[in-house]
């Protein structure tokens, strides 16, 4: 691998922005390393209340003590969080007493989001997804002879993810909060 790096910035509609930095050392003697960091954000997306942000990272360090053995340690992940515009009816539904049950597109418009609003002056989304499950591994490649090789991988992946909302069967949900 050759030594080198790059920096990139991308912007799009509805406030989408992404910046990426990457660098590779090339092989320096018996060692080599690569890194990539990425960040994106979009807080004014097409539908109100659907903003989010996330990162991506990749780190790899390689070691080649001789022509028969190669080792590589790698870590990568992509934490993210974003709000949702959960499905809504085309037409507003009302309760038997005439109060609005679920506002539809006829009230909110195409960019509307019945899961988003303001509470005490702060934006609040009832539906937010979050996720981060990094993966790390250690590879060992061994050339036994001209006709045989052995490749082993030890890896681990632990993380968390989920979402918020007032649907489901939990001990407590937003619909029960009064």
Model-derived segments and their meaning:
Residues 1-8:
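A beta-strand signature from Gram-negative outer-membrane beta-barrel systems
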Residues 11-41, 46-85, 136-144:
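Transmembrane beta-barrel wall of Gram-negative outer-membrane proteins
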Residues 68-141, 164-178:
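Acidic/polar loop-and-plug regions of large Gram-negative outer-membrane beta-barrel proteins
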Residues 152:
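Active-site loops and adjacent core secondary-structure elements that bind or stabilize anionic groups
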Residues 156-158:
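Acidic, polar low-complexity intrinsically disordered regions
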């Amino acid at each position: 691998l050759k030594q080198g790096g790059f920096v990139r910035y991308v912007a799009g509609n509805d406030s989408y922005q992404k910046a990426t930095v990457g660098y590779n050392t090339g092989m320096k003697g018996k060692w080599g390393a690569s890194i990539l960091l990425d960040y994106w954000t979009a807080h004014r997306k097409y539908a109100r209340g659907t903003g989010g942000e996330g990162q991506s990272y990749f780190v790899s360090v390689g070691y080649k003590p001789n022509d028969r053995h190669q080792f590589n340690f790698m870590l990568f992940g992509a934490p993210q969080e974003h709000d949702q515009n959960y499905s809504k009816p085309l037409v507003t539904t009302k309760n038997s007493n005439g109060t609005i049950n679920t506002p539809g597109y006829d009230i909110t418009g195409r960019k509307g989001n019945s899961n988003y609003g303001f509470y005490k002056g702060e934006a609040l989304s009832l539906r937010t997804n979050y996720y981060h499950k990094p993966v790390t591994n250690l590879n060992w490649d061994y050339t036994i002879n001209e006709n045989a090789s052995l490749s082993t991988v030890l890896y681990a992946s632990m993380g968390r993810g989920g979402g918020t909302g007032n649907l489901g069967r939990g001990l407590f949900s937003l619909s029960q909060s009064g």
